[in-house]
Structures are given as structure tokens and as C-alpha cells.
Regions:
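Short alpha-helical transmembrane segments in multi-pass integral membrane proteins
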Residues: 1-12, 67-132, 165-231, 287-352, ...
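Transmembrane helix-bundle signature of multi-pass secondary active exporters and lipid flippases
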Residues: 10-65, 129-136, 224-225, 230-289, ...
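Transmembrane alpha-helix boundary and packing residues in multipass membrane permease domains
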Residues: 12, 16, 27-28, 45, ...
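A generic alpha-helix surface/boundary motif
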Residues: 23-24, 61, 102-103, 140-141, ...
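Alpha-helical structural context
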Residues: 32-33, 111-112, 149, 176, ...
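Membrane-helix interface segments
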Residues: 37, 151-154, 180-181, 257-258, ...
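Small-residue-rich hydrophobic transmembrane alpha-helices
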Residues: 40-99, 139-150, 154-155, 261-319, ...
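Short runs within selected transmembrane alpha-helices of multi-pass transporters and secretion channels
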Residues: 60, 128-147, 155-166, 184-199, ...
């Protein structure tokens, strides 16, 4: 079983490694632009992460799991038809990011960081969302189509190249060409557009294992197959990033340095998402195939094997972050106050990262199984603890900003535990099938 997971996880893990490297580079570039730029970038960060998470792991998981279940049930016609529906979802969702955020973020910059910072970085949202949102949705959706067909290697090759090119292009545009934060967004728009076109060439030529049927009329039932998992997963991504935004808003009362510092800590926290996705993308497909064939015990074994692998991989990193936070903080910023606060936040966060990675990996497995109620419950506990407990401790104790660092660490730990508890026979079984999945698959 480990060999099966590794065979599919290796390409996704390579993509995740390249993505983590690129995200580190993005954080470093933003920090090199100065504390004001880092503060603006930190305010936009939850929305940037939301864009990636909803298009890749969330709705992408819905696309991948729907296609995997169709192929697991030997319904190739349905898999062919699902591609058109997935592309419609991607295009509309991309516009829902591009248009509102191009205008909302400059206002948020002004409210949370000041008019001067908002004016200086006003073009960043236009580039990062106005130009990049639709291409990002398209490339991640087409990647999900290929993963649903088990073609992880094709996705791996293209996306590793894309992330590495982006890693080089961001500092070129932002620092060398002196475009500032807008250069980061412009680089993302260029890379995602080219990657989306290349990914479409793979899908349209049948390299997903089937030829997409774009002539078929759209069907509500096929949209539901994707959205029954994808919408709930998107809601979870929204909750996660709303948590980050609300904590950032609370920390704004303590000064710009605290906002910038938490941006660094939040980026490290969310690095667990692509790391978990490296294994989780394989689990979505493998679990989806097992569920499509009615093999629920096999699906649970696959999920827990993959989750254990993710936990063991992230444990050393989490311990290093917790025990040596100053080293990581100093890598991102030279500002003494920002560095001190970032190290303080990371010293709490590091202990929680392995449990968070475990929960995130099982979340991706839950997509393949169509079992999203456990992750959804975990998401609500996450925001309640991070924001609610943080506010309580900040008022009732002398922890001040540290209250939010502690509460965020507690929140992602509880998230992992709740998702883990949901992956059990009483939930993951044919008898407990979700109504939407039952109706779409014809099983009870």
C-alpha cells in the first residue's frame, strides 16, 4: 500500500516541494521590499492563499474525486463530460476572485496599514487577482482532471517547472525591474497563464486517460458531483483564511510590526497545506477509486497510511521551527522588532505543525471519500479557538499579542485531531453515505 501511495505521491510531492520553495521566495521578496510592503503583503496573504487553496486542493479535490469515482465505477462517459463542467466552475470562480478583490484589497490596505501604504501598493491586487485569478483557477482545475485520471506524473512535470520559473521570475519583476509587490502578481499571472495553456493541451489530447467531451450539454447532476465535495472544501478554505485575516486584524492594534511578523508565521503554517497535498493528492485519487468500487475498508487503510507518512515527514520540521524559531525568522527579515515577534509566534506554532499536517492529509483523503462533515466541523473549531480564545486570553491575561500566537497553535492542533477522529468505520462506510454521493452514484 505504501508503494502505491508513493507511486502517485512522488510527483505531487515534487510539486509541493517546488511550491514550498516558491512560497519561501515570495515571502523573502516581500520582506526585502521593506516592512511596509511586508505589511501590505501580509494583509493580502489570506486572499492569495484562499485563491490557491480553493482552486487546487478544494474545488480541485472535488474535480479529482468526481472523476476518480466515475473511473472507479467504469463510467468513462461521465468522466469525459465532467471536464466541461469543471472548466465552467473554474472560469466563474476565477472571476469571483478577480473582480471584487482588485477593488477590495486597496481599501483594506488603507484601513489596516494606512493610506500611504495603500497608495504605494495599489497595483498589487490588480496584478495578483485581476490578472492571475482566472489563469490560476484554470491551471489547477486542469491539473485536477489529470490527477483524477491517475496521471500525476504529467501534472508533476509541468507544475514543478511552473513553480520554479515563478520562483525566479518574482524577484526579477519585483526587485530587479523595481515593480514592487505588483511584480509578484505580474509574475504569477504570466506563469499561470502559460501553465494553463500547456495543461489544456495535455487534457484535450486524451492524456488524462479519456477525451474530454465539450459538446455535451451542461447537466445539474454533473455540477453537483463536483460541487458536493468542492463547495464544502472551499468553505473550509474560506474559514481557514478568514481565521488568518481576523487574527491579523486583531494584531493590527499592536502595530505594523506585529502584522508583518504574523504574516511570516502564517506563511509557515500554510506551508503544511502543499506539504500535505503532496501525499493528499494521491489519497484523493486512490480513496476515490476505492470508494467508487465500494471498497470502504481499503479506503480507510489508504487514508491512514498516507496520513502517517505526512506526520512523520513534518515532525522534524515542526520541532526545528519550535526549538529554533530565531533562525527561521531572521531568514525572512532584518527588522529587529518584526524578527522578534515572528520568532515568538513560530516558537508556539512549530509544536502544532505535525498534527495540522496529519489533519490536512486526511482532509484530502476525505474529499476522495466524499466525507467532508468531519473536516467542516474541524474548520469551525479552528476559527473559534484561534479568534475567540485569542481574544479571551488577550483580555484576561497579560499575554497581549502572544495570546493570538498561542490560540492559533491550539486551533490547528484541534483541527488535526477532529479530522482524524472522523476517519473511522462509523463515518467512512457505505451505510453512512452522504445523500449527494448516494444519489449521484446510484448506491445506498
Amino acid at each position: 500500500m505504501i508503494a502505491r501511495i508513493l507511486a502517485l505521491a512522488a510527483p505531487s510531492a515534487a510539486v509541493s516541494a517546488a511550491q514550498v520553495l516558491t512560497q519561501f521566495a515570495e515571502t523573502l521578496v516581500a520582506a526585502r521590499l521593506g516592512t511596509d510592503a511586508l505589511a501590505a503583503w501580509s494583509i493580502a496573504l489570506p486572499f492569495v492563499l484562499l485563491l490557491q487553496q480553493t482552486s487546487a486542493g478544494a474545488m480541485g479535490g472535488g474535480v479529482s474525486s468526481a472523476i476518480a469515482r466515475a473511473l472507479g465505477a467504469n463510467d468513462h462517459d461521465q468522466a469525459c463530460a465532467l471536464v466541461k463542467h469543471a472548466l465552467w466552475i473554474a472560469f466563474i470562480a476565477g472571476l469571483l476572485f478577480a473582480i471584487p478583490l482588485s477593488f477590495l484589497l486597496p481599501w483594506l490596505f488603507s484601513r489596516l496599514a494606512g493610506d500611504e501604504i495603500a497608495h504605494t501598493h495599489r497595483f498589487y491586487p490588480l496584478a495578483a487577482f485581476g490578472l492571475a485569478a482566472v489563469p490560476a483557477w484554470l491551471v489547477n482545475t486542469l491539473s485536477a482532471v489529470l490527477r483524477g485520471g491517475g496521471q500525476h506524473r504529467i501534472v508533476g512535470r509541468l507544475m514543478v517547472i511552473a513553480w520554479l520559473v515563478l520562483c525566479l521570475l518574482m524577484p526579477l519583476c519585483a526587485l530587479v525591474l523595481e515593480l514592487g509587490l505588483a511584480g509578484i502578481g505580474l509574475a504569477q499571472a504570466l506563469v499561470f497563464s502559460v501553465a494553463a495553456w500547456l495543461m489544456w493541451q495535455k487534457v484535450r489530447s486524451g492524456q488524462a486517460g479519456f477525451l474530454p467531451d465539450l459538446s455535451i450539454a451542461t447537466q445539474t447532476a454533473l455540477f453537483k458531483k463536483i460541487l458536493s465535495v468542492g463547495l464544502m472544501a472551499c468553505a473550509l478554505a474560506l474559514i481557514a483564511n478568514l481565521t488568518t485575516f481576523l487574527v491579523n486584524a486583531r494584531l493590527a492594534a499592536y502595530g505594523t510590526a506585529h502584522v508583518a511578523a504574523y504574516g511570516i508565521a502564517a506563511r509557515v503554517e500554510f506551508l503544511m497545506v502543499p506539504v500535505s497535498f503532496g501525499v493528499g493528492a494521491a489519497l484523493t485519487a486512490l480513496v476515490g477509486h476505492a470508494v467508487g468500487a465500494g471498497q470502504w475498508p481499503e479506503a480507510r487503510r489508504i487514508a491512514w497510511t498516507g496520513a502517517g507518512m505526512a506526520f512523520l515527514v513534518t515532525l522534524p520540521f515542526g520541532l526545528w521551527v519550535a526549538l529554533a524559531p530565531e533562525l527561521l525568522a531572521s531568514f525572512f527579515t532584518n527588522d529587529p522588532e518584526v524578527r522578534e515577534q515572528a520568532a515568538h509566534a513560530l516558537s508556539y506554532l512549530g509544536w502544532a505543525l505535525p498534527a495540522f499536517a496529519l489533519g490536512m492529509t486526511l482532509y484530502f483523503a476525505s474529499q476522495g471519500a466524499g466525507r467532508m462533515h468531519g473536516p467542516m466541523l474541524a474548520g469551525f473549531f479552528r476559527i473559534a479557538i484561534a479568534v475567540g480564545l485569542g481574544a479571551f486570553l488577550a483580555v484576561q491575561s497579560e499575554l497581549a499579542a502572544s495570546a493570538y500566537y498561542v490560540s492559533v497553535a491550539c486551533a490547528i492542533t484541534v483541527y488535526g485531531l477532529i479530522v482524524a477522529l472522523s476517519v473511522r468505520p462509523g463515518v467512512w462506510s457505505q451505510a453512512n453515505a452522504l445523500g449527494s454521493l448516494t444519489n449521484s452514484s446510484g448506491r445506498r
